[in-house]
C-alpha cells in the first residue's frame, strides 16, 4: 500500500485564467481540428466532440443531427447489423464519416463489428469500450483489432493513468478514452472506491499519449460548456459527452409521464436498467455501477449543440486562442473554492 500526496483535480476545482486577446469576436474562433492518426494513417477534420456510446445518447438519430455540426457520435453497440444496414442506406457519406462503431471485447462483439465495418468503407472509426481498461484481455483485444483493421482509427478505453495510456497506444489504439467514474450516471467511485479526478487524469494521459504520437478523449465529468473548455485546456484532443446530450428527441431514451409531465430515462451503461435491458439483469457476482435518472424533455439536440460550441468559442476568446488547437497552450488553470454565484439557482 502507498499514498500519493499530490493533489488531483476535477473540473470543479479550477477556472481558466483570462489573458490578453486580439480577437474581435467569438465568430473569429476556429473550432475545427485536423488530425492524422498514428496507426490508421487516416486524416480527419471536424469539431472534436463525441456523443457518448450510451444507448440513451449514441443513437443513429443523434449521429444524423450532430453531423451537421461536424461533431462525431459513438453509436452504441446494441444495434443489430440489420439496423446498421438500414441506417447506412438512409445516410449520406458526410454523416457516416462522423460515426464511430462501438464494440465490447467478446468474440461475438468482434465478429459483429467486422460485419458492420464491411457494410460501408466510409465507417472509419472503431470505439472499443469497457469500464476497466486495465485488464490484459482488453490490451490483447486492442492489438487484435489493430491487426484486423489496420486502416481504421481505433479509440479504446477507459483508463486514467499515463502508463496504461501508453500501453494502449503501443498496442494499436490511435485515441485513448480517459475517465473512470466521473460520469453523471456512473456510480463506480462509490461502489468500488476506484477513480481519478477527471482534469488530472486528462493532463496526465495527454502528456503520455502525445509523447507517443497518440491522442486522448476526455470521457465524462462535463456538466457545462465551461467543463468542455477545461478538458480541452487540459490537453484533451477530443471530449466525449453523455449527460449533456441526454434527454433530447434524438437521445433514444424511454419516455415516461408523471403528473402530466413527460420525462426521458437516462442511465449508465453499467446500471441495473442497462443490464436488465441488454443481458437480462445484474449477474449474481457483480454490482450495478450506474444509476437511472428522469430528465425533463429538452427538445432537439441542435440547441444544446449550439450552446456548447458557443461556450467553447467564448472560452477561446477569453484567453486569446483564435483556434481550438491553441487553447491548451493558452490555458492557465487557477485553483478555486467557488465556480459561480448560486443565489438564484433554486428559483
UniProtKB/Swiss-Prot annotation:
Keyword field: Metal-binding, NADP, Oxidoreductase, Potassium
An annotated GO BP: purine nucleotide metabolic process
EC numbers for this chain: 1.7.1.7
Catalytic activity: IMP + NH4(+) + NADP(+) = GMP + NADPH + 2 H(+)
Enzyme active site: 186 (thioimidate intermediate)
Keyword match tRNA processing: no
SMART domains found in the cross-reference section: IMPDH (SM01240)
PROSITE patterns: IMP_DH_GMP_RED
Function: Catalyzes the irreversible NADPH-dependent deamination of GMP to IMP. It functions in the conversion of nucleobase, nucleoside and nucleotide derivatives of G to A nucleotides, and in maintaining the intracellular balance of A and G nucleotides.
Record protein name field: GMP reductase
Organism: Shigella flexneri
Amino acid at each position: 500500500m502507498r499514498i500519493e500526496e499530490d493533489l488531483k483535480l476535477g473540473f470543479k476545482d479550477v477556472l481558466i485564467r483570462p489573458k490578453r486577446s486580439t480577437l474581435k469576436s467569438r465568430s473569429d474562433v476556429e473550432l475545427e481540428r485536423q488530425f492524422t492518426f498514428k496507426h490508421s494513417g487516416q486524416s480527419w477534420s471536424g469539431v472534436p466532440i463525441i456523443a457518448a456510446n450510451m444507448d440513451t445518447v449514441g443513437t443513429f438519430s443523434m449521429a444524423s443531427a450532430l453531423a451537421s455540426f461536424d461533431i462525431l457520435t459513438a453509436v452504441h453497440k446494441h444495434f443489430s447489423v440489420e439496423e446498421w444496414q438500414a441506417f447506412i442506406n438512409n445516410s449520406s457519406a458526410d454523416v457516416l464519416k462522423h460515426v464511430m462503431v462501438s464494440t465490447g471485447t467478446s468474440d461475438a462483439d468482434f465478429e459483429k463489428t467486422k460485419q458492420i465495418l464491411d457494410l460501408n468503407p466510409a465507417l472509419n472509426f472503431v470505439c472499443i469500450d469497457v469500464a476497466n481498461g486495465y485488464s490484459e484481455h482488453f490490451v490483447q483485444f486492442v492489438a487484435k483489432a489493430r491487426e484486423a483493421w489496420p486502416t481504421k482509427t481505433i479509440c479504446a478505453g477507459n483508463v486514467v493513468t499515463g502508463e496504461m495510456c501508453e500501453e494502449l497506444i503501443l498496442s494499436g489504439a490511435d485515441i485513448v478514452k480517459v475517465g473512470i467514474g466521473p460520469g453523471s450516471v456512473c456510480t463506480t467511485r462509490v461502489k468500488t472506491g476506484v477513480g481519478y479526478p477527471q482534469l488530472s487524469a486528462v493532463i496526465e494521459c495527454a502528456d503520455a499519449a502525445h509523447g507517443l504520437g497518440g491522442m486522448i478523449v476526455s470521457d465524462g465529468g462535463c456538466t457545462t460548456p465551461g467543463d468542455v473548455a477545461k478538458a480541452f485546456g487540459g490537453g484533451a484532443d477530443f471530449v466525449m459527452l453523455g449527460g449533456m446530450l441526454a434527454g433530447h428527441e434524438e437521445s433514444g431514451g424511454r419516455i415516461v409521464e408523471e403528473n402530466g409531465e413527460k420525462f426521458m430515462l437516462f442511465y449508465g451503461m453499467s446500471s441495473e436498467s442497462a443490464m436488465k435491458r441488454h443481458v437480462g439483469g445484474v449477474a449474481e457476482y457483480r454490482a450495478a455501477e450506474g444509476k437511472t435518472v428522469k430528465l425533463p424533455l429538452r427538445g432537439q439536440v441542435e440547441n444544446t449543440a449550439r450552446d456548447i460550441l458557443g461556450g467553447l468559442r467564448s472560452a477561446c476568446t477569453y484567453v486569446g486562442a483564435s483556434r481550438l488547437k491553441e487553447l491548451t497552450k493558452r490555458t492557465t488553470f487557477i485553483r478555486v473554492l467557488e465556480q459561480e454565484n448560486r443565489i438564484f439557482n433554486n428559483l
